[in-house]
Amino acid sequence: MDKSSKPTIRLLFATKGCAISHSLLLLTGQISTEPLYVVSYTWTPDLDDVFVKNGREEITQVIPTKRPREVTENDEENQIMHLFCSRDVNVIFYLIGGFSTGDVRSRVWPIFFCCFKTQTDFKALYKALWYGAPLNPHIISDTLCISETFDIHSEVIQTLMVTTHHLNRKGLSDNGLCITEATLCKLVKKSVGRQELTSLYAHYERQVLAAYRRLYWGYGCSPFWYIVRFGPSEKTLVLATRYYLLQTDTSYNTLETPLYDLQAIKDLFLTYQVPALPNCSGYNISDLLSFDKLSMFCCSSTYTRGLTAKNALSYILQRIHTDTTEIHAVSEYITNDRKGLKVPDREFVDYIYLAHFECFNRKQIADHLQAVTYSDFVNKPVLLKSSNLGKRATANFFNHVRSRLNMRDYIKKNVICDVTELGPEIGHKYTITKTYTLSLTYAAKPSKFIGVCDLATTLTRRVENIEKQFSPYGWSSTIPSNPPGFDELSNFEDSGVSAEALRAANFANDTPNQSGRTGFDTSPGITKLLLFFSAATGIATHDVSILSYKTPLEALIGHSEVTGPMPVYRVALPHGAQAFAVIANDTWSSITNRYTLPHEARLIAEDLKQINPCNFVAASLRDMQLTLLLSTSVKNVSKISSNIPKDQLYINRNELFNTNLIITNLILDVDFHIRKPIPLGILHAGMRAFRHGILTAMQLLFPKAVVNPNKDPCYFYKTACPEPTVEVLDDDNLLDITSHSDIDFYIENGELYTCVEENYTEDVWFFDTQTTSEVHTHADVSNNENLHETLPCNCKEKIGFRVCVPIPNPYALVGSSTLKGFAQILQQAVLLEREFVEYIGPYLRDFSFIDTGVYSHGHSLRLPFFSKVTTTGTAVGQLLPFYVVPEQCIDILAFVTSHRNPANFHFHSRPQSNVPVQFILHNLGGEYAEFFERKVARNKQIFSSPQISLTKALKERGVTCLDAFTLEAFVDSTILESIVEHIAVHFPGRDREYTLTSSKCIAIKRDWVLFQLICGTKGFTCLRYPHRGGRTAPRTFVSLRVDHHNRLCISLAQQCFATKCDSNRMHTIFTLEVPNYPNLTSS
């Protein structure tokens, strides 16, 4: 019978002395005087009849903590000896150690291979395994299988023979250092055994000992090492030792077999809650100071044998499988969603963290641990599908996320439209009073300019004079005499606390400022004044015949019989100046007629009608050809800016968004941040998918409108690339800063005004209009079917678009927040278009490309056909038509011409049809946008917010009155002592500065109190860095608050003036928990 197929026991042992020295004595045929102690062991299934007994009987019988072996051993010993003696049993002895090869690292390594056959040998083995009795070395010597044992050591012996030159010198190479290949082959074939090892040990004892000690590197482990590594409980000491060292004696760093460290194994065994009897040895963990006690304790444990031990392996394997299955489920969801979930980078990071948090938050983990806890002693553990961790996460999170991957489901499940229906008469009046007058409609012939255009300061004075004239007749003045500013913070004047420090402390503690404001109160700026004037339709019914004009708007325009609403424009002038314009009628044809297709291009456009619109590639190339024909025909465009506002009005013009009016055209400010230049054919193909996604979303959002994604127009305008050396002035930064009510936000972030058109970057990259018509001819459209072979766009980092989509009749939008939400929905709709992602996705740096910051009252957006202004006064980057012809377009030339109609690219244009507005979309609800941010905030509220108030925490410590005097007394008497002790330990020598310190309360909030420490000596020094020279002492603060673990904490922070410490910025040094000493301050 093959010895490898016999019943086998794998046994980990230790000795009181050096285990390597005693083992080498046995291997070389000598008898050691030091016995062996069994630490842990395991067996093969064919020995279950010996080691696995009726567990219920073991549990129910009463066994004293210390039992005399002579009384209880006889019957059990006879039964075990009978089972043992009926077969031969292999016993393999192990020591901690082994080889490390690639990804595989052994934890234990065999040293003896024995075969037990006689009753005497089995009796000694029984006492060692059942009661931890020392195993006599004579037993090992008598049962040692020489051949199998030295098969284990053959490689070590061969290596030692080579390294100690225990070969014929003729086998060496000429240099005497390397063994020849022939000699190595001969050595490998040569069998080695006890004789070779004995010879090596006799002649090279130090080298042999060193080699074996390197191999069995755990030979010197003490009992304390086992307790520390595998303890501290009996269950983990016995079960984790056996599983970690004998049942998984090798660590595999592969994906197929997940690598669990020892702490993880110990944690897994905590949920294996099978009842166990007290240890028969009578020892506690603290008593195990020698190997004889450790062996007796481990071998006498209930966890060593029986059903408890047998089921432990099955349980831990199933537990690992269950845990890894749940974890991999999250990874699979994330991997699959990564391909289809196209969201901005910030949102995707939030998604990754949220996905893990939804599966592994405290409640989910607690439920999972409860589900996998096993306490059944008899039945085999079955943990398959016991945990619903992944299912809950799928239901609560992933299903909601995946609804964003289908446009119809996304809008149905995430978007709630609040729509108000108007009657025909009300709708007609509402349309007239809330949209621009018909004078804005494009006219083929030049018309007379009626309006006003001047510098901001001039217009401000003009408006003030007009309001003074009309205020006696019912006009409500918009300019207060004393604009409000900051409320004085009297509590802080004598504390020396800077406003920056207070803001930093407020921000750190998530509390509002003292006055409860969200920003500075400022007077209305010129932008708000002009928007108010332009949207007003009249004044009170007083007799104003004594005035030159009937309405303030007529007085502002300087022309009678004009009615509003009217568009308000901002005009960027050279050197950072700006002007504003309110226009009732304009010569739009003089602006747009220069951007017409030439006669020969019209003939080509007629030929392009023959292209099959269903052919996506051909249609994209057709659109590219039309765009290039226009760009090459543009001539006599001024590139020099003017300081005269009325002249500059025709070079740069930006429409101001007016929340007082309704939105009839959706204007999207699109900026694609790209990795590399995009071929023009690819760009046109991507924008065709962009158009289809927008119109598909509108079809779903406006169910009572007739929307045809294959026919309805969508107008694209692309910016032109400036000269490489031109520094572009971000003219959207020139907006009137006083038009912002939340100006403190911009001041705190180092900006006076956030860029509107370029909200996040200052670079502007435009489409190249210098490509000659000879590069792409009509032959390209019919012959070139590869969009990737078209010439690349010259934009290197960013491509800017203006996309104008008419709101379908009879709908209109109202409100800044509504339009922002609408733009976010459309961005998601575009990302759900497969063609868009396939064509343009590989070129994009991120998937956030629609800027919603422009949809705020008083913000402006540059109109098509106008340029930006550089710092040198040069006009660059015109917004030129970028044609995307609908599939079912009947008249291509008419579609091209409609790009020049200003009624198609103004926010508040009057609908060109005679159908009045009937449905007003005034709010968008649901989780259509910022889903991840809302989920993060909700989870933070649930899991990270304190459950007890600061008042309650202080009352538990005897502070019943939350006034400044009581709080200061509490800090001085209770908290400062803990602070000084902490500083003495972690900042030696600095505690002297805090010995005579007192506190001064400077801010009391609902969940946060701020104190400033007053030094009684020379002053405090910086605790962050040692600064040179005599610097002003930093301010030191302590804040009292309750953390998310419901602990009352005190934080010490400093405000140092040194540059190294961020120049007076508040920095928290450390945080301590306030001990719970009730009634400390009651006296």
Swiss-Prot record:
GO molecular function: DNA-directed RNA polymerase activity; zinc ion binding
Zinc finger residue extent: CHC2-type: 1022-1061
UniProt keyword Isomerase, yes or no: no
Residues at the site labelled Essential for primase activity: D669, D671
InterPro entries: HSV_PRIM
Subcellular location: Host nucleus
This protein's UniProt keywords: DNA replication, Host nucleus, Metal-binding, Transferase, Zinc, Zinc-finger
Enzyme Commission number: 2.7.7.-
An annotated GO cellular component: host cell nucleus
Pfam families per record: Herpes_UL52
GO BP term, pick one: DNA replication
Principal place of residence: host cell
Subunit structure: Associates with the helicase and the primase-associated factor to form the helicase-primase factor.
Assigned protein family: Belongs to the herpesviridae DNA primase family.
Task of the protein: Essential component of the helicase/primase complex. Unwinds the DNA at the replication forks and generates single-stranded DNA for both leading and lagging strand synthesis. The primase initiates primer synthesis and thereby produces large amount of short RNA primers on the lagging strand that the polymerase elongates using dNTPs.
Name this polypeptide is given: DNA primase
